[in-house]
C-alpha cells in the first residue's frame, strides 16, 4: 500500500471539539493542520481545506469559492441529516463532501482520494 504524501491542511472550524479532533487525526496521519476560526483562505502551501459548512461565522458561501480560486481542494462537512448543508456545499463548489462521521472514521481515505485526484 503506497504511503500518502504529507500535506498542509487548513481546518476551518470554530467548534473546539471538532477542531481538536481533526488536528489530532491529521497529525497522526502525518499531515500538518492549520486551524482557522475566521474565513481566511490565504495559505500558499496548503493543498486541502476542511470546512464546516454549518458554521455561519466562517461564511462558507464566500470561503469555498476563495479556496477554489487559490487552488486548494475543499472538503465540506456537515451532519448526515443536514442534507441542505451538504447540498449547499455542493453548490458552493466543494470538491469533496463528507458527513461528520465520514470525516471522523474515513479521513485517511478522503485525503488519499484528494491526492489521487490531484495527480
Residue ranges and their predicted role:
Residues 93-105:
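Output/docking surface of receiver
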Residues 29, 70, 92-94:
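Short, structured coil segments at secondary-structure junctions
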Residues 36-48:
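Acidic, metal-coordinating helix/loop segments flanking the phosphotransfer/catalytic sites
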Residues 2-34:
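Short, charged N-terminal beta->alpha structural module
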Amino acid at each position: 500500500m503506497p504511503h500518502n504524501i504529507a500535506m498542509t491542511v487548513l481546518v476551518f472550524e470554530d467548534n473546539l471539539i471538532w477542531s481538536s479532533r481533526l488536528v489530532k487525526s491529521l497529525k497522526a496521519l502525518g499531515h500538518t493542520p492549520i486551524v482557522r476560526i475566521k474565513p481566511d483562505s490565504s495559505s500558499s502551501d496548503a493543498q486541502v481545506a476542511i470546512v464546516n459548512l454549518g458554521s455561519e461565522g466562517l461564511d462558507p458561501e464566500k470561503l469555498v469559492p476563495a479556496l477554489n480560486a487559490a487552488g486548494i481542494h475543499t472538503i465540506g462537512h456537515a451532519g448526515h441529516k443536514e442534507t441542505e448543508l451538504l447540498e449547499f456545499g455542493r453548490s458552493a463548489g466543494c470538491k469533496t463532501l463528507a458527513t461528520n462521521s465520514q470525516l471522523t472514521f474515513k479521513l485517511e481515505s478522503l485525503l488519499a482520494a484528494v491526492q489521487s485526484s490531484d495527480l
